[in-house]
């Protein structure tokens, strides 16, 4: 159980305390909810939930945004956290509790938030100068997102290895996931978001108790859209529409504390212990990225082979 919480320090800013009793009670409710629903594969301890909650609070403060949740999932071994979120059973209670208790101002918990940034009207150098290339098209993307009824926030590409941006609609019970947000050069693809529309995802359980949601869910259409097509596909009546935006950092290309430091140079975080830089080999996204890197290395080695062949041909011509 958590016995202390080190406040987040920002240059020229006050401390933002967290009510430990609130965190403990919420994590207990979430753990009990998972067990009560009989989800044997969803075995996550209360300590792990507390870690997720506190991490979300820390990063939510850095991003200055109340509608996006950042989750660091190394406390959930051998499990892809996005699959947990995409369980049609677990999403409503788990996500609603988090969004209700963490991502909006709370009068009872002692958590204070910085006002939301108006991304469309004023630049924020301390956050946006290092975000490339989203910052170049920030107004355009923000306007598109606002028409769709949700908001966007920039991501620092150098700090992550794999990112998925997922929106959950309470109205239609759909998950809208944008994968492949970064390329091998650690740059965000500003206009190349791949669209995955998931209808009522179901969860299967194998012998090891792991979620097989990724293999059983139904994906409709997979295509890159320009802004106009993007708006036409997803435009729906915005009245009474509730959409949750969620950023899931699966694994990092830098240590945990170093990544947090990258988010804002004016923020300093306590040293996090027991965080390995090497993610589990069972992660599917990591394996696919290793395959891509390996294939690129093969392609880069081809010119050397061509040079060798050319040399041999020159030798043959000399005879």
UniProtKB/Swiss-Prot annotation:
Subcellular location: Virion
Source superkingdom: Viruses
Principal cellular location given in the protein's record: virion
Protein name: Capsid protein
GO cellular component terms attached to this protein's record: T=1 icosahedral viral capsid
Keywords, alphabetical: Capsid protein, T=1 icosahedral capsid protein, Virion
Purpose of the protein: The capsid protein self-assembles to form an icosahedral capsid with a T=2 symmetry made of 120 subunits.
